[in-house]
Amino acid sequence: MASGDGANGGGGGGQGKLPRKRFYRARAHSNPLSDSHFPIPISPDEVDLSQHYPRYFPSGEGEARQGDAAVPRIRFADVGCGFGGLLVGLSTLFPDTLMIGMELRDKVTEYVKERILALRASNPGKYDNISVVRTNSMKYIPNYFRKAQLSKMFFLFPDPHFKEKNHRRRVISMQLLDEYAYVMEVGGIIYTITDVEELGEWMRSCLEKHPLFEAIPEEETKADPVVKLLSTATEEGQKVARNGGQTFQAIFRRISLQE
């Protein structure tokens, strides 16, 4: 990964000043099927973790140590992380877990980088376990993660792509669930939430039909501290709450293939 792709260096965030969103305006969504220009690792071994987590990986060692089973690995992925609210909330809830946000929009990615740098500068010893990368998760998930590497994946308020001809752009589909299942460990959890009922039904239906995922009972999700963050940590979730809107969750566990 090219230098500077992670939350390590550059910008005013290093002085502890949180960035202002008005300087990072971008479209609400991007077309995931279009070709964008940004560096893509050939394989997970090419991901230089020192660019993302300098506290855990001294400069230049992140890439070389990726194959070492003893070193920390990214365990959570927030796909389409937006302005990084979920990452910030999860960081203190799981302070010893490496997690990354994956965002296609360049200005939004830059905002999250600066936000993380500012949080690290003003809270020494905290927020070192989160980072962000600009990438297209619908194309390059296997380039970043090994088989069974992730324990949690998040898809919060994704683009609904209302038109039927654009449903192939949706970030949850049977084909993409194959890839997500590959990078998730058995027992790992996939979290989805939306304020669009039709999309909520679509995501739930895809997950129910896929042989490598099963729904988690409601009583179990109520005991999961992560679930509350789904609707409260992100800008989109807060907007829905302010407007008195309804949300639709689908939370599923990665299972092994039934014989």
From Swiss-Prot:
This is tRNA (guanine-N(7)-)-methyltransferase. The keyword RNA-binding applies. It comes from Oryza sativa subsp. japonica. One of its GO terms (biological process) is RNA (guanine-N7)-methylation. CDD domains: AdoMet_MTases. It is an enzyme of class 2 (transferase). The active site is at D159. The keyword Transferase applies. InterPro entries: SAM-dependent_MTases_sf (IPR029063), Trm8_euk (IPR025763), tRNA_(Gua-N-7)_MeTrfase_Trmb (IPR003358).
